[in-house]
Amino acid sequence: MHGRLKVKTSEEQAEAKRLEREQKLKLYQAATQTVFQKRQAGELDESVLELTSQILGANPDFATLWNCRREVLQQLEVQKSPEELATLVKAELGFLESCLRVNPKSYGTWHHRCWLLSRLPEPNWARELELCARFLEVDERNFHCWDYRRFVAAQAAVPPAEELAFTDSLITRNFSNYSSWHYRSCLLPQLHPQPDSGPQGRLPEDVLLKELELVQNAFFTDPNDQSAWFYHRWLLGRADPQDALRCLHVSRDEACLTVSFSRPLLVGSGMETLLLMVDESPLAVEWRTPEGRNRPSHIWLCDLPATSLNDQLPQHTFRVIWTAGDAQKECVLLKGRQEGWCRDSATDEQLFRCELSVEKSTVLQSELESCKELQELEPENKWCLLTIILLMRALDPLQYEKETLQYFQTLKAVDPMRAAYLDDLRSKFLLENSVLKMEYAEVRVLHLGHKDLTVLCHLEQLLLVTHLDLSHNRLRALPPALAALRCLEVLQANDNAIESLDGVTNLPRLQELILCNNRLQQPAVLQPLTSCPRLTLLNLQGNPLCQAEGSSEHLAELLPSVSSILT
């Protein structure tokens, strides 16, 4: 054995590594303690820079030590000559780059570099752009570096066209680049500002067509990559609806005025103010939500004094002015009438299709044909299927209703993990279609039975509905937003899976509630119905609570004003 090199056993190697780690830890802790002691004593000199360099060079994410470094550099700024300071800054930039090589996603390092360059009289921004390009070449999804690049581009006033060309180069190299696609969505509206395009920034048609060609190349190259599909969704546009008062309703019986808005707002929050004019005279009122909660809502209402509802006059005019939205609506309550209202005769574009809004329907039609072509090649691509559905919704939701439902079935089979989400999205679209049909027919009755609904949306659109049929669906609860249905008189929800009635509250006109064959377990779940003053008929047949002993007596005690309770 003599003359041969001894080979360490695995146990010896592990022990040696343990001792090495312990030694490094002792040095690390000693250096850290020394830095803190010097900082506490106010000894902010170059020795602190040296000590923190040793620690941060190994662990760039020690935020407190970056703070110490900044304190030292601020101290040295007033002590050093310009030449010495330039040498110090050059060394600091080099040290920061070495830290980024250790951890390219170090928050503290990137922040410190921003801080340092912001204090320089003439920073070399071209060098910083080159540094970003180098690090993005290593990892094009490093969002820390992308944030820093946007900072540098803003400070250096880099033209958006140059930055767009930079994203071109990265996307050409690798289509799967979320950050590059996102940066394009920020740059294009700057390059091509459109009047009245809103905060989302709509693009001119020629630019849009060019971008659509680019993104089509991406998802035809790799149909399963999500980044291009998300950018495609942005290109189609998501315009915000215009601020508007959708509906104004006055009830003489309830001595109440109700307003429906195009978006949720918080009245009395300083920004959102409602002014009520009755017969051209301002009336001070207290605004509240139907649920009585102080939070943003589509629906706001107020109580009216008896003088504003005097039936001796031929009519009363009510006008609500929304100051933040610069919108108003007026309705008339005629003598002898119990209610009056005014609502928008909204088209589908105004109500729902603003979510996908491209000026030219030919562009949408072309996109739909391209996606269908891709779907033939990739029949199980979920992104393609979802995009086809959204394009059909954008083009004509009623014309494509049947075809859309077929695509939903295919999509659920392809992507069963998101079946619940797809069921809810399908329910949302079906409810939108039903609301559109009701609007066109100008009726106050809405039939949503046998549609396999799993969720209720857009209830703020149903302020004037008097009869609502939700029978034979898959609803598990009636949502609090149901309180928006201030005119509702009859609610049918047979044959669902309803377990809770928390949403059936404060419905001033509700007279009949049909809940046969649901999953109501205990009489206590009916407590919310005590807030519905006109409820006279309640049908609970086929619910588990009907099997409990003494349930009829308990229900009669809980709801004494309900004259007919069927169990």
Curated annotation (Swiss-Prot):
PFTA repeats: 44-78, 88-122, 124-158, 159-193, 207-241, 363-397
GO BP field: endoplasmic reticulum to Golgi vesicle-mediated transport; protein geranylgeranylation
Stated family: Belongs to the protein prenyltransferase subunit alpha family.
Primary role: Catalyzes the transfer of a geranylgeranyl moiety from geranylgeranyl diphosphate to both cysteines of Rab proteins with the C-terminal sequence -XXCC, -XCXC and -CCXX, such as RAB1A, RAB3A, RAB5A and RAB7A.
Annotated GO CC locations: cytoplasm; Rab-protein geranylgeranyltransferase complex
Keywords: Leucine-rich repeat, Phosphoprotein, Prenyltransferase, Repeat, Transferase
LRR repeat positions: 442-463, 464-486, 487-508, 509-530, 534-555
Domain of life according to the entry: Eukaryota
EC number assigned by the record: 2.5.1.60
PTM sites of type Phosphoserine: 98
InterPro entries, A to Z: LRR_dom_sf, Prenyl_trans_a, RabGGT_asu_insert-dom_sf, RabGGT_asu_insert-domain
Subunit composition and interactions: Heterotrimer composed of RABGGTA, RABGGTB and CHM; within this trimer, RABGGTA and RABGGTB form the catalytic component B, while CHM (component A) mediates peptide substrate binding. The Rab GGTase dimer (RGGT) interacts with CHM (component A) prior to Rab protein binding; the association is stabilized by geranylgeranyl pyrophosphate (GGpp). The CHM:RGGT:Rab complex is destabilized by GGpp. Interacts with non-phosphorylated form of RAB8A; phosphorylation of RAB8A at 'Thr-72' disrupts this interaction.
Name of the gene encoding the protein in the UniProt record: RABGGTA
Activity regulation info: The enzymatic reaction requires the aid of a Rab escort protein (also called component A), such as CHM.
GO molecular function (one): small GTPase binding
Gene3D superfamilies for the chain: Protein prenylyltransferase, Rab geranylgeranyltransferase alpha-subunit, insert domain, Ribonuclease Inhibitor
Pfam families with a match to the protein in the record: LRR_9, PPTA, RabGGT_insert
Catalytic activity line of the entry: geranylgeranyl diphosphate + L-cysteinyl-[protein] = S-geranylgeranyl-L-cysteinyl-[protein] + diphosphate
Protein's recorded name: Geranylgeranyl transferase type-2 subunit alpha
